[in-house]
Amino acid sequence: MTTGNAFGAEATLKTSAGSVRYFRLRKLVEDGIGDIETLPYSIRVLLEACLRNVDNFVVTADDVNNLANWNAAKPAEIEVPFKPGRVVLQDFTGVPAIVDLAALRSAMVRMGGDPKKINPLVPCDLVIDHSVQVDEFASRFALQRNLEIEFERNIERYQFLRWGQKAFNNFRVIPPATGIVHQVNLEYLADVVMTTNGVAYPDSLVGTDSHTTMINGLGVVGWGVGGIEAEAVMLGQPIYMLTPEVVGFRLTGQLPEGSTATDLVLTVTQMLRAHKVVGKFVEFYGPGLDGLSLADRATLANMAPEYGATIGFFPVDAETLRYLERTGRPKQLVDLVERYYKEQGLFRTANSPEPRFTSTLQLDLADVVPSMAGPRRPQDRILLKNMLPEWKKALPGFGRTGASPTVAVEGSEQPAQISDGAVVIAAITSCTNTSNPSVMIGAGLLAKNAVARGLKRAPWVKSSLAPGSRVVTEYLRKAGLDTALDALGFQTVGYGCTTCIGNSGPLPEPVAKAVTGGDLVAAAVLSGNRNFEGRVNPLVKANYLASPPLVVAYAIAGTVDIDLSTQPLGQDPQGQDVYLKDIWPTQQAVADAVASSMGPEMFIEQYGQASAGPPEWQKISGSEGDLYQWDANSTYVQEPPFFVDMPTEPAPIQGIEGARCLVSVGDSTTTDHISPAGSIKANSPAGRYLQAQGVKPEDFNQYGARRGNDRVMTRGTFANIRLRNLMVPGTEGGVTVHYPSGEQTSIYEAAMKYRDHGTPLVVLAGAEYGTGSSRDWAAKGTYLLGVRAVIATSFERIHRSNLVGMGVLPLQFREGESRESLGLDGTEIFDISLDDRLVPRQAVEVMARKADGEVVHFVTTCRIDTPVEVVYYRNGGILHTVLRQLAKS
């Protein structure tokens, strides 16, 4: 871990648990190296990591000097190596990561090396949270039944993880039914200060989920990366990035009565998206921090991917210490955190000088009002009072012209009719909000008030409560609010991501028939962080993000075609109208309930048994041995082809000639569009493959659970039912046109035809290509389809990195140019000029030849951003690079 003391900065710090060594940032100040006192706190953490890890090979003295002299106005475009202290994984991205490690071990043996060289060198925690689905709901049996179904569907994956637990050191699995990875990280895993070999240093991490940034609320630097990049970190590689710009977000005032942390984060997301912070750090500062609970901070940090930032950081301060105490962390750890951060100049107080920032924004918390976001993007905020007119305005965008049909829900227990805007899913879900006691207690109090007035959930609404940790269940029970939530159909359905990631399960059949029969624009209201098309449920077109109390309110109303500020939710038994304002809890009522229902003993009790898991987990045994025994008949875990027949040395970089366009897409194409996580259709290429292997459609599970099998995932790439390939106007789904035949076919089948003829492929895209989840299979699947370059107006940070990590060339149109302006429609043949002299961000010429002989020449910017990424690209990917290095060592 610690490799040297080049600056003479090593010192000793006394704590209540004894002395620790550390690397003094103040030594740099004493030596006249930089103005550290006014650096952003997030940059100070990166600086400490460089100072501690100087070895003049991976990390040099120049790296320390460059960060210490960070220029706020124009940070130098210099590559910074960062060695995170640990890695967190969730199972949808974690299983394929461990599959890759197993495949690397197999490849190492084929290359004559020691397979044990492939082993995590930093602590890795995998939390199983992505597999539970909402099959049963509104029942006291829902939790147990959904858990049983989860194990039935995923037993093979879980057996594989059991093998991984035994085969790899530094690797821990947190079993199903414990919670959501980011909430578990916040409440349990994060120490804020780590100690290794007697050296104390700031906790830091990367995670295979974009919402890893939630931990920034605790003062821990961490962000989401693709699985392939996380695997490289596990194997001892640093993260390389350009020196970041840091945007300061100044908060003042306090949240007003009636507004929640959810309203705040939707406001901040809208502001920061407009400010364009992709690839930048955001750091919150100002007097408003003193009135924000740590849970509120975590909510703001969680949605950094939605506003586009790498991190959304809050410095460690007195509230951090109080949170550590409230969540049952050991007193000696809290003492170490306080002493270490104060000694290092990393501890914020009201009197701390405001840091220097590249740019700043400001928000008075008093200006935050009740809000929602949707129907397609989290940055599209809508004031609650404007929901009705905004809904009317959105309807034509879903193809509705004229009057909305009214359809009977036939076969349901209660006779009902629904129309456009019917809320068919109301889900209290996602670590973004279930980690925040104020909004969870608020939802419970609103439910209690609603039940007291005789209100009920609309019968067509599929309602669910999926807390991010078991502690939530305990404090709701202690506050006496669980029974009211149960009465409205918000029984706990599982401890995992559920609806937020598309695991909403099927709609009740009568509701599904009504929606499809009437071609209704049905709606979902969820307390999640993403609402992209096709994500929540394939039958739900309009998706709105809202606070947990508003989720309960809309479950009662049963429609978004309503103005909750002026129209009643329903009537009480006496026929009196009941309005939202009548049942909305006051801030004081929420604060009192939080104070009386929560204590550190809850966290100690629940997390004291976190590693044991439910009985279903304890019964599973994995195979033995350092090498995984691949089963050719498995439909869940297969050895991926990435390292099979890999040459010892890489070939020189060459141009791409005679390429065809496989897919052409517009702006904001998400990783969900590229590699969906949800259900597998029986008539899709992946569905047909599974049926050919003897898997019945009811046993397909979902794409996310099949990520250990490249055969399924390659067929599922660009298979989202809401994908709009502009090469096939008027269609949705995974279809394209094969050239020169002109045949309309599935994207997978077209790719295989091109492969058979040795034709390389490209993808054309608009702005924000690859936005959304950190999903490395969006890059892996792209590569396995034969795509060698993606030409886009702009890229989201993680997906660009993942493409490079898989050896796919990201090219960006020059400012003012685009697919449209150049007249590219996907029928062209592309030649991309490239050779072994490639350097970061160089100009790359592209020639597109049209069928009529016209030739379009244009220049792009190569989005291989750093020198080490050139090395990765030359080797065919980051893991290929690491494997070759380890094989030679």
Name each model feature, range by range.
Residues 55-254, 261-266, 370-373, 387, ...:
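Long, structured ligand/cofactor-binding scaffold of large enzymes
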